[in-house]
Every structure is written in structure tokens, then in C-alpha cells.
């Protein structure tokens, strides 16, 4: 089959602090963080990716949390392998910066013919990752009343680590559009 893996999430401003926010009547405004989470189905298999940008000039706090989430996402993606509990590295980076309470979901999930499959890549997850699995790596920081940042890639777990499957650019600094 083909189509979309799930209803896309497009959330801006304070609504970007809702990890699974859906479209609303809120207009996208200058200065807003804008989170876009989307996926497609190709040949029966799902995909999932998220990027966060800023509409216009970014507030210093938006830059701070983007930089933090970016560092956590890259570190976890680089370290993930069948023996490693990847959630811990991202969670530690975010917690050490004082935002641990604002990373309220697991690091990721399996993706296959369904958008959310085992394994859970989370401190709540059971068991280890296995070579051949496809998982997401999607840390986030969500500040109620301000906004949120999530960066998500899909990874193929190998014997020695992971190969990033997502081809969409992931800027090291918050992109102002």
C-alpha cells in the first residue's frame, strides 16, 4: 500500500509543546516554533520523521532547547546498537541541562507495517534491540506555555550500531524560516 503512516502533526507556538498535538484554528505566527511530524507508507511499510523549525527570529530559549535536543538526538543515534540502552544517553543529556522533567516520552519505537511496533526504545522498554530492527530516535523537550522541540529520524539497527535512514536534512542549529 501507499499513503500516509498517520495524520501529520503540525503544531506551532505553545501548541508545539503537545507531543501529539493535532491541527487547530491557531494561526502560525512570526516567532513560533513549528514542529512537523509526518510519515508515508511505501510498499506496505511505514515511515516516521519529525523536524522543528522557527518561523522568523527564534527566541534564545527556543535556540537553547533546539541545541539540547539536537545534541541528545545525535548522541543517541551515534551510540545506539543491539546492546545499548539508547534512551539513557538522550535522557541524561536532557536531564543534566535541567530539562529532564520536560522529556515526557520514550526515545523511540519500532516501525514496520504499523507505525508503532515493538520494540519500545524507552526506559520502560523490555529487552534489547536486535540487528535488523527499524526504530525511531526522537528525543524532545516540551515547555508548556512556550513550545517544544522534537527531532526524529528512523534508524536501521546493525550488529555494530545503526544506519540513519531519514534523508531529510537535520540542521545543527535552529532553522529560521
Q: Where are the predicted features?
A:
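Active-site neighborhoods and metal-handling regions in enzymes and metal-associated proteins
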Residues: 1-177
Amino acid at each position: 500500500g501507499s499513503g500516509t503512516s498517520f495524520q501529520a502533526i503540525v503544531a506551532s507556538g505553545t501548541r508545539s509543546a503537545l507531543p501529539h498535538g493535532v491541527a487547530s484554528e491557531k494561526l502560525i505566527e512570526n516567532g513560533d516554533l513549528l514542529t512537523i511530524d509526518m510519515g508515508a507508507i511505501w510498499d506496505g511499510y511505514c515511515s516516521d520523521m519529525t523536524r522543528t523549525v522557527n518561523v522568523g527570529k527564534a527566541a534564545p530559549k527556543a535556540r537553547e532547547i533546539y541545541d539540547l535536543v539536537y545534541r541528545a538526538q545525535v548522541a543517541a543515534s551515534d551510540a545506539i546498537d543491539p546492546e545499548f540502552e539508547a534512551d539513557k544517553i538522550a535522557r541524561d543529556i536532557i536531564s543534566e541541562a535541567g530539562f529532564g522533567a520536560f522529556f515526557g516520552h520514550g526515545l523511540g519505537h519500532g516501525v514496520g507495517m504499523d507505525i508503532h511496533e515493538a520494540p519500545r526504545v524507552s526506559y520502560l522498554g523490555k529487552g534489547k534491540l536486535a540487528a535488523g530492527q527499524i526504530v525511531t530516535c526522537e528525543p524532545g523537550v516540551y515547555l508548556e506555555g512556550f513550545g517544544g522541540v522534537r527531532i526524529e529520524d528512523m534508524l536501521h539497527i546493525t550488529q555494530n550500531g545503526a544506519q540513519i535512514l531519514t534523508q531529510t536534512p537535520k540542521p545543527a542549529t535552529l532553522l529560521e524560516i
